[in-house]
């Protein structure tokens, strides 16, 4: 019974190493216990990282991307302080699948980066991160990895007590305030109920200096760089003027006849020491130019840039990220029946969020004035408002004396409205009707063979409204069948997996949808894709002290609806976004080699990976701009991604002064264009722009009786591998982030436990700008924050 319950707990239980592989774990006698840390599961068929609730207490932030950015190989997309998606090995959005208890959530970050992932972090119990392709398990949208987030809406095992309550109160100097509670109890012998709610609000986010990068005001950089002007959201009054200091002489003839012959400065300044007088047919000396500076190039230096003024779209205030407000709340209720071999549960969750993006746009592009005075352009702040309803169902059954070990069924229905606002005006809104279901069948172990086979069905209806709608109404259907088999020969283990997916994309344009003048999705053709996913890996265990492994993945991804059908001004990214309904599926072949050692209390691991993409889909510059919008098109070319990751840690039991763990890491990723395309080299360069930079970091955690401490220091290096935005990409300065958490547990009340804690974020108060953030010129990371809170468990 105990094994059955544990099997049913995980949202992705078929991939749990202790069950899928039935591995024998022999604990070392001198291993220090009671310190929970992020552990790379070397004996898993996938390169996974498991993050416990205890670890989340230290690293949890406002967004999922910022929370997971403390993990090697993962960074934050950083679309302002209130929106951030995980970036795994330079990939995010439509290439990183986010799941809740094994079922896909409503994630629109791949369609528009200002949307947040629909996850309530206070209800997360555990996160499993797949840093390599997980497409066999979860389909093509996991071509770059996946996150499986375990929440507590549905109870899967009977609680120890008939009534349990958890509460949280927290306030911070630069993180606002939040409250949360959850409760569960036993209704009858086998029935359990759950209920919970949370609330969060913050007025503004403070920073150590100015919100915009100082280079936004450098006339030598922004004077004639329209793309950088757009990224900085500035108006520049600039012009090209004749370089008078280039010419050694002034034409006397031009001075005498300037008005008569309607001459210009180009005629006035000359390289000739004499001029011809047609009145008498003689040559006379020209006067010298007092402004003349010798040594200049007659062609390159003929004209010079003159910047007369730089003005922000909207004036910013020092020490504050503009439009950085946020508020959110959620509520859930659920019930479960838990029997000896069967459990069935259902839950409902409602969530609301409203937050600002540190950028501005205009509701309507001004028309040409035809010589009349141009009216003043009024820019409005970009805000995001989301309302989501989720219905969840989960059931599992454990067999005995039967070829099938267990069967599990998950369903999630999502009904949401996700609006992009200009101030309070609804510019664009997506109404989502999404249904996902997943069936997993795990077979009984046959000597050295275990495995799981499953079926997954997904449906999404996305309807758009608003004056700045940039996508037609779309419908997506996906169905996939997969199997993952594990062969265990003790010191050598193998994994083999295959998945077949069928994907449909449909666009339904109506009369209210006005397309741009660009490609704008072509003919909005119906598209059908057949995808094949394959995984294989081998692992050699070395004297129970370490391992060597190699894995190969073949993954395929169907283009998303925005890549196929977008066709209008997407104000949130200040781009006229043009999809291409002719795009082919994306194909990736990945090889990863890794190894690790576990010597008593010392652990070290490292891995190298290389992914070759065919038809890598990216949003490319065209070199054209219309009004304030850059014109971009979704294109595909061959790309290569490679990188390394390394970790090490040491645990020590120091007796009276506690149990401690010290660790360190390093990561590097490069996203390289290998296509023989002169257009891509011209527009985007040799490397993909906005690529995550390399990092290294150190951590210390431990506990002394009821006290615990966590410290982390992460250093982000200056990017060496730069792409282009037509013009060469600018690197962000290197920076370091120091975070600390101190906590004390008090169980003297007799009815439960209290935990008092203090958290310090960015304690160095560093101006930190993420190289991979699209808003890096507008917004740094938040400045120093000190939070204090209390948790109660009854």
Report the location of each language-model feature:
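Outer-membrane beta-barrel signature, preferentially recognizing the C-terminal barrel domain
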Residues: 378-400, 522-541, 545-547, 554-613, ...
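C-terminal beta-signal and adjacent terminal beta-strands/loops
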Residues: 208, 556-557, 612-615, 717-722, ...
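Transmembrane beta-barrel wall of Gram-negative outer-membrane proteins
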Residues: 175-201, 212-354, 387-398, 483
